[in-house]
């Protein structure tokens, strides 16, 4: 199997260096890094990397996470002979055994997986947990606030879910190729991954949450601005305002 890492970065050179360092230790066939118009010396540093697995795509402006992941996905689908693509940000990376764990998974009937993303304290990152059931109404949102366990998977139990996070998603290249249109650049940042995963679910794809696929995410805070309740509110609002996306 050929595995490709897809990383999007913007003006976080310090964290990117650690992400690349850890990624280079893993047996990826290719490592695609999308430089989203960084102005902090990122391009010069990326140009100094000598590992031939690394492919740098440089954009002239910041197109957001959605634009960066779409650019990288298009390149991978058109130019690389890869089987599976691992998505993550410039402040995240897979654990040392994640690729081995993925190779041992039963992939029959499933072309997209969502891993368990942990913060620096070793706790699950709420912002990267998928929804086992998307709250698409006001009633669902209220119930989610009271009973979140009805809408998100248990951290350490494999189960089917309805969304993904672009930190910790592993997707088959064939499925990615036919689903590029569902990475919506206009969303820029936040919810692009939720929309993408939910569209896959609506199309009948099985998304498996697999906690044995561990990712590290160097998030310094888990405050209100990135709490799941905040994401749910805007997700529901955007689902209502953007129904055409799912037609």
Set out the residue ranges of the language-model regions.
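Short beta-strand-to-loop acidic/aromatic patch adjacent to the donor-nucleotide binding site
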Residues: 81-91
